[in-house]
Amino acid sequence: MRHTRIALLALAAGLVIISLPVSAHHGNAAYDMDKTVSMKVTITGFEFGNPHVQLFFDTKDDQGNVLHWNCEGTNPAMLTRIGWTRNTLKPGDQITVFVRPNKNPDITVVLLIKVVLANGQVLESRNPV
């Protein structure tokens, strides 16, 4: 009986330790969760795969310089349930994105809230924000 308790305690401790990196991976600490930014962008890439969908797009700054962005969405299974497909976006598409900006303004990695396609269709990301 004593060995069973020790084994169960060790198993529980191991599960807690193993789950910590997963929990850290899903943090939103890099993003300003109190701000929403909208941008008109041109899609340069779209990766519809696990663990998170990635949008790559370009914008221009006030001087006309091209800025390259990486935008993290939620997982493909969730997006599929709300209307996204791997063909939703393709390079060259011009859309509007709504994102949570990075806390560091020099980093062009943002968190997706939703997109508005050229035809006006709105697709949410449904990130747990």
Enumerate the language-model features and the residues they cover.
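Short coil-to-beta-strand transition motifs
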Residues: 31-39
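Short nucleic-acid-contacting surface segments enriched for D/E, G, S/T with interspersed K/R
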Residues: 81-96
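Conserved hydrophobic positions within beta-strands
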Residues: 41-43
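Short aromatic-glycine-enriched beta-strand elements
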Residues: 49-60
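Bacterial N-terminal signal peptides
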Residues: 8-19
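Short, structured beta-strand/loop micro-motifs enriched in basic residues and often containing a Trp
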Residues: 73-81
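OB-fold/S1-family single-stranded nucleic acid-binding modules
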Residues: 102-126
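Sec/Tat signal peptide C-region and signal peptidase I cleavage site
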Residues: 20-24
